[in-house]
Amino acid sequence: MENLDFTALENSLQRLGKVVEIYKKNPQDTIVRDSLIQRFEFTYSITLKTLRKYFIERAFIVDDVNKLSFNEMVRTAMQLNLLKSDLAKWTEFREMRNLISHTYDENVALKVSGIVPDFYEEITYLLKELKGIK
């Protein structure tokens, strides 16, 4: 079985972690907040792609994986003990990602930036679990 390549997720997580630390020190800096949100967006996307690849690599049927809804994918990852948080928290991450991707609004940006540190911790946990199983 071929090993999964986690490089994209590792790199995006590292970049997100750097801006999370900067943002914690200066949350009023809109340039830093914008960077935080953008890095959240692409790390979120890479995370979902990585989970799908993981499921396929671990002998799930490709067509079945491609048909998984978001909720089913999160539940499957939870059953495999890959996630720290529950479906409700992952739904919040998804909602924040969807809100910010359609329009830019100051209040939405503040709301999204508020959950990014939790997201960072979650993806750090996920990556450790994925690499531990690799």
What are these regions (language model features)?
Residues 1-134:
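Solvent-exposed interaction patches of small proteins and small membrane subunits
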